[in-house]
């Protein structure tokens, strides 16, 4: 790709130099805000995600504000105004309705919808958009239309917008196809990993062990000397975190939510913080997560995700996270893999059937049944699983890294093209 023949200063930090014939105007010159309130009974409810704007899933959690939504028309650009939904935006391909937290932009006749989808979803614009927001709490802020409309954009003539959108459609489609291929590989690796876990925690390691009927059709036979117990008899504590959200702070104690349980343990990278006072209150309420406990997500899209707390970090949990403390005669690692296995995951799935929002209660969780071998056998099984899945997890890390590089490459191409740093066509 080549550069344009001549450039000029845009006068805008996030844009830098732009092609000489491009115009710099405020966003309000290219869009008007659509503020028509409608009901989701009249207009299909839409979800605004990082991947774009889509029809709302039937089982998504609904609010009581179905009659208090914003109208969206085909070709409108919609963006979530809150920083914790950063990047959730896109052009809608249909009429519908969105929640009031979103800003709906109707393009004027000086900007194309397909071009605006790339421009306003570019990394540089998104950063500029949220930079103009105002704080709700320490780590959460929102950007209103009054602030958004003042952001300056650099826009080429309509014909050039069309060429840019066409070029990016082709370029990003190739990258997306490569990402999909890598994701397929990860799915296959995860499937292989799950097979290893499932077999080990239901059949054991001795192929010559005497077997008995488990009494459950989808589990089949299990080693004769294994016990079938309910989870409440395998853990000395099964509790969840706080049912109210404390004020977050810039410094303080980690406050674990469902997004912080990463499938192996706790990822503290983006963990919210709370004050010492709130921390002490929640510890007294039984919301502290201790080293050696297994964390299980019990609410939301990642319900069923499991991680073992192996660190000494003092932290408390939200109600979306259950904390399970293994009894002293049990292997923490084995029980973590048991909770990851289809024995428990199938029961989680069944308990959520027909629910508007993915969720399991502590009462149901405590009464899930599971298979329990003797402690020494638990340790052998856990060590075997660790050994067998290690190369699989390494392959997943490498493939995930390749996906990240492809996503980064995609964003670089979009940013370079929509800000005029390179010329297409």
Give residue spans per PLM region.
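A short glycine-rich beta-alpha junction/loop motif
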Residues: 6-10, 82, 96-103, 136-162, ...
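Low-complexity, Lys/Gly-biased intrinsically disordered segments
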Residues: 3-4, 18-60, 66-68, 85, ...
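Amphipathic alpha-helical coiled-coil/heptad-repeat segments
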Residues: 1-15, 21, 156-209, 371-425
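A short beta-sheet element
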Residues: 74-130, 137, 144-145, 257, ...
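Non-catalytic DNA-recognition/assembly elements of restriction-modification systems
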Residues: 7-38, 150, 158, 162, ...
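A structural connector/turn signal
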Residues: 61-67, 138, 150, 283-284, ...
């Amino acid at each position: 790709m080549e550069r344009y023949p001549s450039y000029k200063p845009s006068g805008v930090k996030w844009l830098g130099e732009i092609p000489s014939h491009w115009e710099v105007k405020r966003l309000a010159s290219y869009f008007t805000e659509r503020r028509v309130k409608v009901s989701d009974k009249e207009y299909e409810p839409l979800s605004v995600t990082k991947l774009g704007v889509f029809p709302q899933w039937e089982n998504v959690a609904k609010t009581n504000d179905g009659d208090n939504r914003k109208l969206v028309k085909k070709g409108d650009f919609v963006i979530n105004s809150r920083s914790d939904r950063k990047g959730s935006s896109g052009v809608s391909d249909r009429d519908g309705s969105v929640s009031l937290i979103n800003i709906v932009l109707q393009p004027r006749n000086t900007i194309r919808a397909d071009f605006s989808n790339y421009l306003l979803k570019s990394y540089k614009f998104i950063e500029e958009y949220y930079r103009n927001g105002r704080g709700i709490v320490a780590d959460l802020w929102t950007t209103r239309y009054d602030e958004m409309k003042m952001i300056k954009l650099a826009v080429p003539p309509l014909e050039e917008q069309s060429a840019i959108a066409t070029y990016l459609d082709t370029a990003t489609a190739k990258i997306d196809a490569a990402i999909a291929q890598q994701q397929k590989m990860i799915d296959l690796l995860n499937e292989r990993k799950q097979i290893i876990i499932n077999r080990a925690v239901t059949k054991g390691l001795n192929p010559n062990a005497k077997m008995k009927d488990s009494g459950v059709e989808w589990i089949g036979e299990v080693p004769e000397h294994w016990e079938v117990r309910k989870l409440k008899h395998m853990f000395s504590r099964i509790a969840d975190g706080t049912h109210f959200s404390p004020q977050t702070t810039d410094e303080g104690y980690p406050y674990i939510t469902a997004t912080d349980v990463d499938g192996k343990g706790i990822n503290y990278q983006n963990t919210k913080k709370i004050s010492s006072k709130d921390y002490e209150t929640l510890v007294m309420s039984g919301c502290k997560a201790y080293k050696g406990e297994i964390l299980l997500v019990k609410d939301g899209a990642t319900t069923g995700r499991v991680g073992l707390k192996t660190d000494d970090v003092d932290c408390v949990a939200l109600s979306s996270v259950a904390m399970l403390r293994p009894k002293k005669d049990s292997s923490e690692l084995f029980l973590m893999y048991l909770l990851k296995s289809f024995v428990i995951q199938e029961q989680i799935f069944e308990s959520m059937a027909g629910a508007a929002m993915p969720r399991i209660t502590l009462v149901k969780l405590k009464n899930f049944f599971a298979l329990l071998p003797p402690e020494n056998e638990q340790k052998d099984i856990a060590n075997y699983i660790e050994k067998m899945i290690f190369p699989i997890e390494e392959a997943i890390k490498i493939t995930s890294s390749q996906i990240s590089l492809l996503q980064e490459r995609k964003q670089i191409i979009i940013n370079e093209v929509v800000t005029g740093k390179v010329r297409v066509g």
